[in-house]
Amino acid sequence: TLFRSIDCLGIAKEFNEALYKAFIGAGINLPKHKQMIMTICDSEKDEALPVAKRFAALGYTIYATWGTAKFLNDNGVEAIRVNKVEQESPTLLDLILGHKIDLVIDIPANGIERSHDGFIIRRHAIETGVNVLTSIDTANALLTSLESAGEQHTTPIDIATI
């Protein structure tokens, strides 16, 4: 198996500003439509709930597969149910290809795909310029950056002086 990693550095005096700069440098460019897709395996749903609540508090519309949408709705987070790739329209893929989505959070069970849906969703999202996260930790870091983005005034830092 070949793994690829892209590292990005944000330099600032404050953590939130450095994090914000790192996400911008990595090409994470949010928000446009404030619409996102969440597909979360059962074992990660409890950990993903606070993430969904924070995105909802930022004004994001959350689309989710049936199981994830039911879990979120049952726990006080409004989520719109959308069909999986192989089901009838509207599907998650329809939303991605329709350029309506800014972010996909796709968390498979222990990194294992039970179907090809996750791969198809991630591939098409990346090909159409949609940001994709596959880790709750990264989603939390992005949220920290987004929540403080309104107060961000990025300050240039001369790295030669560090």
Which residues does each predicted region cover?
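Surface-exposed amphipathic alpha-helices with a cationic face
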Residues: 51-57, 73, 122, 126
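Short internal beta-strands
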Residues: 59-71
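Long, charged amphipathic helices and adjacent flexible linkers at domain junctions
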Residues: 15-43
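Mobile "lid/hinge" segments at catalytic clefts and subdomain interfaces of large enzymes
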Residues: 5-6
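Peripheral docking tails and interdomain loops at the edges
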Residues: 83-84, 92-162
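Short, small-residue-biased leader/transition segments that mark boundaries at the very start
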Residues: 1-2
